[in-house]
Each structure stands twice: as C-alpha cells, then as structure tokens.
C-alpha cells in the first residue's frame, strides 16, 4: 500500500512540475456588430487588428438595426442606448455601412467575414422587398439575415412602434425570402424580462 501512495505522490509531483504547453487556439465569432447604437465604429482596420490579436479567423458581422435618438431635451449626447429614455428607431443604412467597410478589404481578408443584413423593421411587411433590393445591390455579399431584434427588453421598451414577434406576418415574409436565397436568419429574443425579476 505504501508503494502505491509513493507512486501516486511521485506522479502528482511530476504532473505539477511539468510545464504547461499553451495551445494555439483559433476562434470564430458568431455575433459581432460592426457599429454601435449611434451607427459609429472604430473602423475595419481596428477590427481586423483585434481579430488577429485574438486569433479570430472568421466572424459573422452585422450592423445594428436601430439607432439611438439624441432627444432635443437632453443637453448631453447619451453614451449608450440606455443612457436616457430617448427612443431608438429602425435604421436601414446600417447595412450600407457594413457593406462599404467590407469593400475596403482585400479578397483574402474579406473571406474572414460573413455579413448578415440587419437594417430592416421586422414589423413592416415591406421588409422582404427592402431585403431583396439590398441583396440585388450587392449580389453574393450577404450570407444571412439578422440579428433581427424581436424581444430585447430594454431596447424593446425604447423602440418606436410595435414590439416585433418572431411569428408575425412581416417576418414570415422575410423567412420565405431567406429560404428562396438559402440564407440563415438570426433572431434575438429574450425569454425573461430585464426590468422585472420574473419570467
């Protein structure tokens, strides 16, 4: 019995003094917004640099489908969407910003990005026509749709208009269009409230 204990103790000692080898992990990011809620960004070169430093080889990239309003009654510009009670509104130009940034890249860098169209109002039955126009403007650029905001709690409370639902008529039309173009759709839908402590 003493021999077994001595062997185990020796094994533990070997394990603890053996140098740990760092692994060369590489990652894919499945959810990255290129812009903030004011549709501003640090730019594509900063993003590529951060990806390189973090070993991120591929990224799903989208804009943000809403923009934060700076209300005339607020003396200072809010720093974030939750900075005050001013509304956010649907903002379709977010996709133009993403597309323009991707076009700055050379072909090898561009292959690292998987852009999703997000700049549409998911309550509007015109959304599918808008998405089709965007797909036609840049054939082959867009690889998916989303992130589509449905219930996003504090953002939902600030969004002008009706709260989107994943099963509304407008999004059903978007799903059919996505199927036609063989595009995945990414939805954001919280299941509990951030404002209240119960589901």
Where are these regions (language model features)?
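Bacterial N-terminal signal peptides that target proteins for export
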Residues: 1-8
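Hydrophobic h-region of N-terminal signal peptides that target proteins for export
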Residues: 10-21
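Alpha-helix termination/capping residues and helix-transition junctions
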Residues: 14, 24, 53, 139-142
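Intrinsic low-complexity/disordered segments
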Residues: 18, 28-30, 185
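Short, solvent-exposed loop/turn segments at secondary-structure junctions
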Residues: 36, 193-195
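Active-site gating/metal-coordination segments in enzymes
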Residues: 74-193
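Flexible, glycine-rich surface segments
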Residues: 197-199
